[in-house]
Amino acid sequence: MVLSAADKTNVKAAWSKVGGHAGEYGAEALERMFLGFPTTKTYFPHFDLSHGSAQVKAHGKKVGDALTLAVGHLDDLPGALSNLSDLHAHKLRVDPVNFKLLSHCLLSTLAVHLPNDFTPAVHASLDKFLSSVSTVLTSKYR
């Protein structure tokens, strides 16, 4: 999915509001995913999945850091996320549908924390961005 200039502007502006909360929001989105889509827990059998768990927070930080990296490389998502794509496709073998589920939970989390900035246009741009990230992360499954 191609991000327009307006989408890129919206994504960068929204992510600038996330600021230093990327890891916190990533962890919250993971918790939402585990609660709303319990089958996703199967990829984390070694994690303490309880609310506020250090392991969920640590993985949330990884998610947040990866998205921050992606926002900084909107014109080259495949290059920026190549290592993560390899990891998820070849080592972790995460079912691609789970990226869509996490994206949904990330959008919900951002809507809660950025209510004044989460306009329909920003929502659409973030959805396209997360869809693009998901596409890149699943590109090496083939």
UniProtKB/Swiss-Prot annotation:
Family: Belongs to the globin family.
Protein's recorded name: Hemoglobin subunit alpha
Residues with the N6-acetyllysine modification: K17
GO biological process, one term: cellular oxidant detoxification
Phosphothreonine: modified positions: T9, T109, T135, T138
Phosphoserine: modified positions: S4, S50, S103, S125, S132, S139
Binding site for O2: H59
Organism annotation: Equus caballus
All residue ranges annotated as the Globin domain in the record: 2-142
Tissue: Red blood cells.
Residue sites binding heme b per the record: H88
